[in-house]
Regions:
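Extended extracellular/luminal ectodomain segments enriched in beta-structured repeat modules
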Residues: 342-351, 406-409
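Extracellular carbohydrate-recognition regions
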Residues: 289-316
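Acidic (Asp/Glu-rich), glycine- and aromatic
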Residues: 31, 40, 127, 136-183
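Extended, loop-rich substrate-binding clefts of extracytoplasmic carbohydrate-active enzymes
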Residues: 7, 70-137, 151-155
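Short beta-strand-plus-loop segments that form exposed binding edges in beta-rich domains
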Residues: 412-420
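Short beta-strands within extracellular/lumenal beta-sheet-rich domains
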Residues: 322-347, 395-398
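Extracellular carbohydrate recognition and processing domains
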Residues: 375-407, 418
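Beta-strand-rich recognition/accessory modules
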Residues: 2-24, 31, 205-297
Length: 430
Protein backbone atom coordinates (compact mmCIF):
# COMPACT_ATOMS: atom_id res chain seq x y z
CA UNK A 1 0.00 0.00 0.00
CA UNK A 2 3.00 2.30 -0.42
CA UNK A 3 2.01 5.64 -1.98
CA UNK A 4 3.55 9.02 -2.68
CA UNK A 5 0.60 10.98 -1.33
CA UNK A 6 1.31 13.48 1.42
CA UNK A 7 0.30 12.72 5.00
CA UNK A 8 -2.35 15.42 5.05
CA UNK A 9 -4.13 14.08 1.94
CA UNK A 10 -5.61 11.41 4.23
CA UNK A 11 -6.94 13.92 6.75
CA UNK A 12 -9.87 15.12 4.63
CA UNK A 13 -13.43 14.49 5.82
CA UNK A 14 -14.07 11.82 3.19
CA UNK A 15 -11.55 9.60 5.02
CA UNK A 16 -13.24 10.02 8.41
CA UNK A 17 -16.36 8.68 10.04
CA UNK A 18 -17.86 11.10 12.55
CA UNK A 19 -20.13 10.95 15.56
CA UNK A 20 -21.12 13.86 17.76
CA UNK A 21 -23.28 14.80 20.69
CA UNK A 22 -24.38 18.11 22.13
CA UNK A 23 -20.83 18.92 23.29
CA UNK A 24 -18.09 17.26 21.21
CA UNK A 25 -17.40 15.74 17.78
CA UNK A 26 -14.92 12.98 16.93
CA UNK A 27 -13.63 11.54 13.67
CA UNK A 28 -12.03 8.10 13.26
CA UNK A 29 -9.88 7.86 10.17
CA UNK A 30 -10.67 4.72 8.16
CA UNK A 31 -7.68 5.34 5.88
CA UNK A 32 -5.43 5.15 8.98
CA UNK A 33 -6.68 2.05 10.77
CA UNK A 34 -9.44 3.89 12.60
CA UNK A 35 -7.05 6.10 14.58
CA UNK A 36 -8.65 9.24 15.97
CA UNK A 37 -7.61 12.26 13.89
CA UNK A 38 -10.38 14.64 14.91
CA UNK A 39 -11.60 15.59 18.38
CA UNK A 40 -13.07 18.97 19.19
CA UNK A 41 -15.61 20.69 21.34
CA UNK A 42 -18.45 22.03 19.22
CA UNK A 43 -17.37 25.32 17.65
CA UNK A 44 -13.71 24.94 18.66
CA UNK A 45 -10.48 23.72 17.03
CA UNK A 46 -9.39 20.15 16.42
CA UNK A 47 -7.11 19.05 19.27
CA UNK A 48 -5.37 16.14 17.49
CA UNK A 49 -2.03 16.26 15.67
CA UNK A 50 -1.49 14.16 12.53
CA UNK A 51 1.78 15.33 10.99
CA UNK A 52 2.82 11.70 10.36
CA UNK A 53 1.53 8.13 10.79
CA UNK A 54 2.96 7.93 14.31
CA UNK A 55 0.80 10.69 15.79
CA UNK A 56 -3.04 10.78 16.18
CA UNK A 57 -4.74 9.02 19.10
CA UNK A 58 -3.91 5.42 18.43
CA UNK A 59 -2.92 1.98 19.62
CA UNK A 60 0.75 0.98 19.68
CA UNK A 61 2.00 -2.28 21.18
CA UNK A 62 5.51 -3.47 22.02
CA UNK A 63 7.24 -6.81 22.48
CA UNK A 64 10.71 -8.31 22.06
CA UNK A 65 12.96 -9.00 20.29
CA UNK A 66 14.71 -5.74 19.49
CA UNK A 67 15.57 -5.28 16.75
CA UNK A 68 12.74 -7.15 15.07
CA UNK A 69 13.33 -7.66 11.34
CA UNK A 70 11.75 -10.52 9.39
CA UNK A 71 13.86 -11.87 6.55
CA UNK A 72 13.72 -9.69 3.46
CA UNK A 73 12.00 -6.74 5.15
CA UNK A 74 13.57 -3.28 5.16
CA UNK A 75 13.97 -1.67 8.60
CA UNK A 76 14.54 1.99 9.44
CA UNK A 77 17.86 2.06 11.29
CA UNK A 78 16.77 4.92 13.54
CA UNK A 79 13.86 2.83 14.88
CA UNK A 80 15.51 -0.57 15.27
CA UNK A 81 15.70 -0.22 19.07
CA UNK A 82 11.90 -0.40 19.31
CA UNK A 83 11.53 -4.08 18.40
CA UNK A 84 8.17 -5.66 17.61
CA UNK A 85 5.82 -2.65 17.29
CA UNK A 86 2.57 -2.74 15.30
CA UNK A 87 0.73 0.58 15.35
CA UNK A 88 -2.77 1.52 14.27
CA UNK A 89 -2.17 4.16 11.57
CA UNK A 90 0.73 2.88 9.48
CA UNK A 91 4.50 2.54 9.31
CA UNK A 92 7.28 5.10 9.10
CA UNK A 93 7.53 4.43 5.33
CA UNK A 94 3.94 5.70 4.79
CA UNK A 95 2.34 2.29 4.31
CA UNK A 96 -1.09 2.47 5.89
CA UNK A 97 -2.85 -0.11 8.04
CA UNK A 98 -5.70 -2.02 6.40
CA UNK A 99 -9.21 -1.64 7.77
CA UNK A 100 -11.12 -4.93 7.81
CA UNK A 101 -14.42 -3.73 9.20
CA UNK A 102 -16.04 -0.60 10.55
CA UNK A 103 -19.43 0.63 11.62
CA UNK A 104 -20.83 3.91 12.84
CA UNK A 105 -23.88 4.17 15.06
CA UNK A 106 -25.48 7.13 16.83
CA UNK A 107 -23.07 7.10 19.75
CA UNK A 108 -20.37 4.58 18.81
CA UNK A 109 -17.69 4.00 16.20
CA UNK A 110 -16.12 0.55 15.81
CA UNK A 111 -13.08 -0.22 13.64
CA UNK A 112 -11.05 -3.39 13.11
CA UNK A 113 -7.75 -3.28 11.27
CA UNK A 114 -4.50 -5.07 10.50
CA UNK A 115 -1.82 -2.71 11.86
CA UNK A 116 1.62 -2.04 10.41
CA UNK A 117 5.00 -2.44 12.13
CA UNK A 118 6.22 1.12 12.65
CA UNK A 119 9.98 0.53 12.02
CA UNK A 120 9.49 -1.77 8.99
CA UNK A 121 8.68 -1.16 5.33
CA UNK A 122 5.24 -2.57 4.46
CA UNK A 123 5.19 -5.30 7.11
CA UNK A 124 1.72 -5.99 8.59
CA UNK A 125 1.49 -6.95 12.25
CA UNK A 126 0.75 -10.56 13.17
CA UNK A 127 -2.41 -9.41 14.91
CA UNK A 128 -5.57 -7.38 14.53
CA UNK A 129 -6.60 -4.23 16.39
CA UNK A 130 -10.15 -3.36 17.42
CA UNK A 131 -11.36 -0.08 18.85
CA UNK A 132 -14.68 1.21 20.17
CA UNK A 133 -15.23 4.97 20.62
CA UNK A 134 -18.29 6.04 22.65
CA UNK A 135 -19.40 9.56 23.56
CA UNK A 136 -20.57 10.61 27.02
CA UNK A 137 -20.88 14.35 27.55
CA UNK A 138 -17.43 15.87 27.12
CA UNK A 139 -15.82 12.39 27.28
CA UNK A 140 -14.80 9.86 24.67
CA UNK A 141 -14.80 6.47 26.39
CA UNK A 142 -12.58 4.07 24.48
CA UNK A 143 -11.94 0.33 24.49
CA UNK A 144 -8.82 -0.77 22.60
CA UNK A 145 -8.02 -4.41 21.87
CA UNK A 146 -5.25 -6.45 20.29
CA UNK A 147 -5.82 -10.01 19.05
CA UNK A 148 -2.45 -11.70 18.67
CA UNK A 149 -1.68 -14.34 16.03
CA UNK A 150 2.09 -14.39 16.18
CA UNK A 151 3.91 -17.41 14.70
CA UNK A 152 6.73 -16.93 17.23
CA UNK A 153 5.32 -18.66 20.33
CA UNK A 154 8.08 -17.49 22.69
CA UNK A 155 6.76 -16.00 25.94
CA UNK A 156 8.78 -12.80 25.93
CA UNK A 157 9.15 -10.55 29.01
CA UNK A 158 6.64 -7.76 29.58
CA UNK A 159 7.18 -4.36 28.02
CA UNK A 160 5.60 -0.98 28.63
CA UNK A 161 2.54 -0.38 26.45
CA UNK A 162 1.20 3.04 25.46
CA UNK A 163 -2.44 3.04 26.60
CA UNK A 164 -2.95 4.87 24.27
CA UNK A 165 -0.56 7.23 22.46
CA UNK A 166 -2.15 10.70 22.36
CA UNK A 167 -0.73 13.57 20.30
CA UNK A 168 -2.17 17.10 20.48
CA UNK A 169 -1.57 20.12 18.30
CA UNK A 170 1.04 22.62 19.46
CA UNK A 171 -1.49 24.99 20.98
CA UNK A 172 -2.05 22.44 23.77
CA UNK A 173 1.47 22.24 25.09
CA UNK A 174 1.25 22.57 28.87
CA UNK A 175 1.48 19.22 30.68
CA UNK A 176 -0.59 19.18 33.87
CA UNK A 177 -1.35 16.43 36.41
CA UNK A 178 -1.54 15.70 40.10
CA UNK A 179 1.70 14.03 41.19
CA UNK A 180 1.46 14.29 44.99
CA UNK A 181 0.83 11.76 47.75
CA UNK A 182 -2.73 12.82 48.59
CA UNK A 183 -4.71 11.92 45.47
CA UNK A 184 -8.39 12.71 45.06
CA UNK A 185 -8.29 15.47 47.69
CA UNK A 186 -8.11 18.49 45.32
CA UNK A 187 -4.51 19.07 46.40
CA UNK A 188 -2.32 21.39 44.28
CA UNK A 189 -1.59 20.37 40.68
CA UNK A 190 1.84 20.12 39.04
CA UNK A 191 2.69 21.85 35.76
CA UNK A 192 5.16 19.37 34.27
CA UNK A 193 5.75 21.03 30.90
CA UNK A 194 5.55 24.81 30.47
CA UNK A 195 6.93 27.46 28.14
CA UNK A 196 9.25 28.61 30.89
CA UNK A 197 10.79 25.34 32.12
CA UNK A 198 12.15 24.18 28.75
CA UNK A 199 10.97 20.62 29.37
CA UNK A 200 9.03 18.35 27.05
CA UNK A 201 11.62 16.52 25.01
CA UNK A 202 12.75 13.89 25.80
CA UNK A 203 9.35 12.79 27.10
CA UNK A 204 8.98 12.89 30.89
CA UNK A 205 8.25 9.74 32.90
CA UNK A 206 6.02 10.50 35.88
CA UNK A 207 3.27 9.19 38.14
CA UNK A 208 -0.17 10.80 37.79
CA UNK A 209 -1.42 9.61 41.16
CA UNK A 210 -5.00 10.64 40.33
CA UNK A 211 -4.88 8.52 37.13
CA UNK A 212 -5.26 11.45 34.74
CA UNK A 213 -3.07 14.00 33.00
CA UNK A 214 -3.76 16.77 30.49
CA UNK A 215 -2.28 18.93 27.77
CA UNK A 216 -3.75 22.43 27.90
CA UNK A 217 -3.25 25.86 26.37
CA UNK A 218 -2.40 29.21 27.95
CA UNK A 219 -5.94 29.36 29.34
CA UNK A 220 -5.75 25.86 30.86
CA UNK A 221 -8.16 24.44 28.28
CA UNK A 222 -7.41 21.24 26.41
CA UNK A 223 -7.45 17.45 26.46
CA UNK A 224 -7.19 15.08 29.42
CA UNK A 225 -6.55 11.34 29.48
CA UNK A 226 -7.88 9.11 32.27
CA UNK A 227 -7.12 5.42 32.80
CA UNK A 228 -7.92 3.50 35.97
CA UNK A 229 -5.43 0.65 35.68
CA UNK A 230 -2.03 2.37 35.93
CA UNK A 231 -0.30 5.27 37.70
CA UNK A 232 2.64 5.41 35.32
CA UNK A 233 2.73 7.73 32.31
CA UNK A 234 4.76 9.72 29.82
CA UNK A 235 4.08 13.33 28.90
CA UNK A 236 5.92 15.90 26.83
CA UNK A 237 6.18 18.24 23.90
CA UNK A 238 8.28 17.87 20.76
CA UNK A 239 9.89 20.92 19.11
CA UNK A 240 10.06 22.78 22.41
CA UNK A 241 10.65 26.24 20.89
CA UNK A 242 7.20 26.07 19.24
CA UNK A 243 5.04 25.66 22.32
CA UNK A 244 1.65 27.32 22.10
CA UNK A 245 0.86 27.25 18.39
CA UNK A 246 0.42 24.89 15.47
CA UNK A 247 -2.20 22.75 13.75
CA UNK A 248 -2.75 19.11 12.75
CA UNK A 249 -0.14 19.18 9.95
CA UNK A 250 2.65 20.88 11.93
CA UNK A 251 5.61 19.04 13.46
CA UNK A 252 5.25 20.43 17.00
CA UNK A 253 3.08 18.28 19.22
CA UNK A 254 2.10 17.48 22.78
CA UNK A 255 2.19 13.86 23.92
CA UNK A 256 0.58 11.75 26.64
CA UNK A 257 0.82 7.99 27.02
CA UNK A 258 -0.33 6.15 30.14
CA UNK A 259 1.90 3.09 30.50
CA UNK A 260 0.88 -0.44 31.35
CA UNK A 261 3.43 -3.24 31.58
CA UNK A 262 2.12 -6.35 29.84
CA UNK A 263 3.20 -9.72 28.50
CA UNK A 264 1.86 -10.14 24.95
CA UNK A 265 1.52 -13.88 24.39
CA UNK A 266 1.51 -15.14 20.82
CA UNK A 267 -2.26 -15.81 21.04
CA UNK A 268 -3.51 -13.27 23.59
CA UNK A 269 -6.58 -11.08 23.27
CA UNK A 270 -5.79 -8.07 25.44
CA UNK A 271 -7.83 -4.90 25.93
CA UNK A 272 -7.70 -1.72 27.98
CA UNK A 273 -10.15 1.12 28.61
CA UNK A 274 -9.49 4.84 28.88
CA UNK A 275 -11.30 8.16 28.55
CA UNK A 276 -10.46 11.35 26.68
CA UNK A 277 -11.87 14.44 28.41
CA UNK A 278 -12.26 17.85 26.73
CA UNK A 279 -12.43 21.04 28.79
CA UNK A 280 -10.76 23.25 31.37
CA UNK A 281 -8.22 21.48 33.56
CA UNK A 282 -10.42 21.73 36.67
CA UNK A 283 -13.29 20.13 34.74
CA UNK A 284 -10.97 17.39 33.46
CA UNK A 285 -9.88 16.68 37.02
CA UNK A 286 -13.39 16.49 38.46
CA UNK A 287 -14.52 14.27 35.59
CA UNK A 288 -11.61 11.94 36.31
CA UNK A 289 -12.69 11.85 39.97
CA UNK A 290 -16.12 10.63 38.87
CA UNK A 291 -14.70 8.07 36.47
CA UNK A 292 -12.36 6.72 39.13
CA UNK A 293 -15.21 5.81 41.47
CA UNK A 294 -15.61 2.61 39.45
CA UNK A 295 -11.91 1.69 39.46
CA UNK A 296 -10.50 -1.23 41.46
CA UNK A 297 -6.75 -1.26 41.96
CA UNK A 298 -6.74 -3.58 44.97
CA UNK A 299 -8.28 -6.86 43.76
CA UNK A 300 -6.80 -8.94 40.96
CA UNK A 301 -8.21 -12.17 39.52
CA UNK A 302 -6.32 -14.54 37.24
CA UNK A 303 -9.32 -16.52 36.02
CA UNK A 304 -8.54 -15.85 32.35
CA UNK A 305 -5.52 -13.55 32.17
CA UNK A 306 -2.75 -12.02 34.30
CA UNK A 307 -4.82 -8.92 35.23
CA UNK A 308 -1.78 -6.66 34.60
CA UNK A 309 0.69 -8.73 36.70
CA UNK A 310 3.97 -9.73 35.09
CA UNK A 311 7.34 -11.29 35.97
CA UNK A 312 11.07 -11.11 36.17
CA UNK A 313 12.80 -14.38 35.16
CA UNK A 314 9.57 -16.40 35.25
CA UNK A 315 7.62 -18.09 32.46
CA UNK A 316 4.08 -19.21 33.18
CA UNK A 317 1.78 -21.54 31.23
CA UNK A 318 0.60 -18.81 28.91
CA UNK A 319 -2.71 -17.38 27.77
CA UNK A 320 -5.44 -18.09 28.66
CA UNK A 321 -4.31 -18.72 32.20
CA UNK A 322 -6.84 -21.48 32.87
CA UNK A 323 -7.87 -20.05 36.22
CA UNK A 324 -4.54 -19.16 37.80
CA UNK A 325 -0.98 -17.99 37.37
CA UNK A 326 0.87 -21.30 37.32
CA UNK A 327 4.66 -21.12 37.34
CA UNK A 328 7.99 -22.32 38.67
CA UNK A 329 10.11 -19.74 40.48
CA UNK A 330 13.77 -19.57 41.39
CA UNK A 331 16.09 -17.51 43.55
CA UNK A 332 15.85 -13.86 42.50
CA UNK A 333 12.81 -14.26 40.27
CA UNK A 334 9.86 -11.93 40.85
CA UNK A 335 6.09 -11.67 40.57
CA UNK A 336 5.42 -8.00 39.82
CA UNK A 337 2.23 -6.01 40.37
CA UNK A 338 0.96 -3.34 37.98
CA UNK A 339 2.31 0.18 38.68
CA UNK A 340 -0.55 1.43 40.83
CA UNK A 341 -0.34 3.93 43.69
CA UNK A 342 -0.69 2.85 47.34
CA UNK A 343 -0.86 5.54 50.01
CA UNK A 344 1.20 5.41 53.20
CA UNK A 345 -0.45 3.11 55.73
CA UNK A 346 -3.30 2.41 53.34
CA UNK A 347 -2.65 -1.33 52.97
CA UNK A 348 -1.78 -3.88 55.64
CA UNK A 349 -1.45 -7.18 53.81
CA UNK A 350 -1.32 -9.00 50.50
CA UNK A 351 -3.72 -11.94 50.39
CA UNK A 352 -2.81 -14.75 48.01
CA UNK A 353 -5.40 -17.33 47.02
CA UNK A 354 -2.92 -20.00 46.04
CA UNK A 355 -1.81 -23.62 45.95
CA UNK A 356 1.74 -24.57 46.89
CA UNK A 357 3.55 -26.99 49.15
CA UNK A 358 6.19 -26.23 51.74
CA UNK A 359 7.70 -22.88 52.59
CA UNK A 360 8.17 -19.93 50.25
CA UNK A 361 10.48 -17.18 51.45
CA UNK A 362 11.54 -13.92 49.95
CA UNK A 363 11.11 -10.17 50.12
CA UNK A 364 8.29 -7.82 49.28
CA UNK A 365 9.95 -5.05 47.27
CA UNK A 366 8.04 -1.78 47.55
CA UNK A 367 8.76 0.83 44.87
CA UNK A 368 8.65 3.84 47.17
CA UNK A 369 7.31 7.01 45.57
CA UNK A 370 9.58 10.02 46.05
CA UNK A 371 7.85 12.44 43.69
CA UNK A 372 9.73 14.20 40.88
CA UNK A 373 13.36 15.08 40.27
CA UNK A 374 14.63 18.44 38.99
CA UNK A 375 13.62 17.49 35.42
CA UNK A 376 10.10 16.47 36.51
CA UNK A 377 10.85 12.78 36.06
CA UNK A 378 9.63 10.06 38.40
CA UNK A 379 11.74 9.21 41.47
CA UNK A 380 11.41 5.73 42.97
CA UNK A 381 13.49 3.76 45.46
CA UNK A 382 13.17 0.12 46.45
CA UNK A 383 12.52 -1.01 50.02
CA UNK A 384 12.42 -4.67 50.95
CA UNK A 385 10.54 -6.47 53.74
CA UNK A 386 11.10 -10.23 54.28
CA UNK A 387 8.17 -12.62 54.01
CA UNK A 388 7.61 -16.32 54.56
CA UNK A 389 4.47 -18.35 53.80
CA UNK A 390 3.72 -22.06 54.16
CA UNK A 391 1.44 -24.25 52.08
CA UNK A 392 0.04 -27.76 52.37
CA UNK A 393 -0.50 -28.49 48.69
CA UNK A 394 -4.17 -27.56 49.01
CA UNK A 395 -5.71 -24.34 47.76
CA UNK A 396 -5.86 -21.78 50.57
CA UNK A 397 -5.57 -18.08 51.35
CA UNK A 398 -2.30 -16.91 52.87
CA UNK A 399 -1.29 -13.41 53.89
CA UNK A 400 1.89 -11.40 53.51
CA UNK A 401 2.26 -8.52 55.98
CA UNK A 402 3.05 -5.22 54.24
CA UNK A 403 2.30 -2.86 57.11
CA UNK A 404 6.03 -2.07 57.40
CA UNK A 405 6.07 -0.14 54.12
CA UNK A 406 7.51 3.23 55.25
CA UNK A 407 5.84 5.46 52.66
CA UNK A 408 3.63 5.57 49.58
CA UNK A 409 4.63 3.15 46.85
CA UNK A 410 3.84 2.51 43.20
CA UNK A 411 3.54 -1.21 42.71
CA UNK A 412 5.45 -4.00 44.41
CA UNK A 413 7.27 -7.23 43.66
CA UNK A 414 7.42 -10.56 45.44
CA UNK A 415 11.08 -11.54 45.09
CA UNK A 416 11.67 -15.22 45.80
CA UNK A 417 14.64 -16.45 47.84
CA UNK A 418 14.10 -20.13 47.15
CA UNK A 419 12.85 -22.35 44.34
CA UNK A 420 9.48 -24.00 43.91
CA UNK A 421 6.14 -24.04 42.17
CA UNK A 422 2.95 -22.08 42.87
CA UNK A 423 -0.51 -21.58 41.42
CA UNK A 424 -2.07 -18.20 42.28
CA UNK A 425 -5.78 -17.64 41.65
CA UNK A 426 -6.08 -14.08 42.92
CA UNK A 427 -4.25 -11.31 44.77
CA UNK A 428 -6.07 -8.91 47.08
CA UNK A 429 -4.47 -5.91 48.75
CA UNK A 430 -6.21 -5.16 52.07
Amino acid sequence: MSEEKSFDSYLTDDNLIFIENEYIRIGANISLGGALTYLAEKGKKNLINSSDWGRQVQMSFYAPPAPYQPEGVEMAECWKFIGWNPIQSGDCYRNRSRVLEYRCEDNEIYVKCIPMHWPLNNCPGECTFEVWYRLDGYCVNVTSKINMDRPDKTQYPARHQEQPAVYTNGEWYKGVAYTGKKPFTNDSLTELVTKENGLGWPWLNFAPTENWSALVDDNNYGLGVYIGSTNLSKIGFAVTDKKGWGGPKDDQTGYIAPLGCEILDHNISYSYDYSLIVGQVDFIRQTAYELDKNADRRHFSFERDRDHFYYKDITDKGYPTGGCLDFDFGIGSELKSPPVFFGKGECKQIELDATFEGEISGDVIFHLYEGLDEKNNLKLSDYGVPFSIKGTGERATCSVDISAAPDCFIGFSLRFNNSGHISIYSVNIE
